[in-house]
Amino acid sequence: VVVKDKKGNPIEGLTAKDFIVAENGVPQAIRFCEHQELAGAQSAAPVAPSKPEDIKIYRDLARTRISPETPGNIRYKDRRLLALYFDMTAMPPPDQLRALAAAQKFIRTEMTSADLVSILRYSGGAVDVLLDFTAERNRLLSVIATLIVGEGQGSDESTDDASRSDTGAAFGQDDSEFNIFNTDRQLAALETAAKMLGQLSEKKSLVYFASGLRLNGADNQAQLHATIDAAIRSGVSFWPIDARGLVAQAPLGDATKGSPGNMGMYSGASALAVTTGFQQSQDTLYALAGDTGGKALLDYNDLTRGIVEAQQTVSSYYILGYYTSNAAQDGKFRRIKISLNSNLSANLDYRQGYYAGKQFSKFTAADKERQLEDALM
C-alpha cells in the first residue's frame, strides 16, 4: 500500500492499527504490517561506478533461482526489486539487440543504490533465472553482454557451478503440448516467472521485453486470466516494453511476407488486416500492464524509458498481510478496500482485489483444459 499526502509525499510511521482492510465489505484482521522506505527515484541520483567496468563474456550462463526470504534476512528490506525478463521466443534478433541495449543503458546510467536487478530469460520452453537480484553492475552487464554475443562464444567460466545443471530452469510446455491445448506459451511462461518472484513479500516490477503478444482465440483467455491472477497474488506488476519501438509499416506488409493478392490489395482490406494484426499484438501487453498495476511502453524507440518508469513508480510503501475470513472456493473476484483508521487525509494506492481459488465442480471448459495441461508439465 502506497500512502501519500496531498502534496504527493510518502507518509511514514504508520502501524497495523492505522489501517482498515475490508474484503467484499467484510473487515479483516491485519496480521502483518511492514514499512519499506525507499528514496524517490527522481531524487536518488544514479550511482557512478567506483571502479572501471570489468565485463566478461561467459562461455555458459548460470541457471540459478530467486533466493527466497528467510527469517531475519533483511536483504530485500528497503530495496527496489526490478526483474528484467527477455522473451526470446517473441523477439526477432534485431529486437533482441534493442532490448538488451536498453537494459545495458539503464544499468549504466539510471540504476540507483536502492535498486536490485534480476535477469530472466524465456527460451527453449523454459524460464531461466540467469541472475538473482543483485546490485553488482559488472555481473549484470556481463550476463547481458553474453546474451548479445551468444553462449558458447566466450572464454570465461561461469562463477556458478549450477551453470552445468538443469536444476535452475523452470519447465515449460513443449511445442506438441501447446499445439494440442492451444495455449499461448508466452503467457504460461510469464505466469511461471510471476510465481518465482512470489517467494518474496516485497513489491516486484517485472519488465517484460517482447515484440508484441497476440492471443490465439478465446481459449487463451483462461491463460491470460491465470497469468494476471498469479501476478496479483505474487505482488508482481508487469511493465511490458514493445521491443519493436515505433514502427512504420508498409500498407501490404514488408518483404518478409508474400503479396496478399486478391481484391484486398485494391479495396484496402489487406492493409487494414496488417494494421489490425499489429494493434492486436499490443492489446495483450496493455492488458497485462493495466490489470497488474504496471504500464506498457508502446510505439517508443527509447526502450530504456520503460524500465525507468517502472523504477520511478516504486516509492516507499507498506506491506499488509491478512488471512481471509471467506473460505469459499468459488473462483470469484474479491474486492479489497483499504482505508486509514485515523483522521489522516491521504491518498492510498493498492491492489484492488484478487480471484479466489475454484473447486473443480465450478471449472469451465477452459479451466479444465488448463488443469490437464498443468498435470502434463
Model-found features: residue ranges?
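Scaffold/interface architecture of coatomer-like assemblies
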Residues: V1-M377
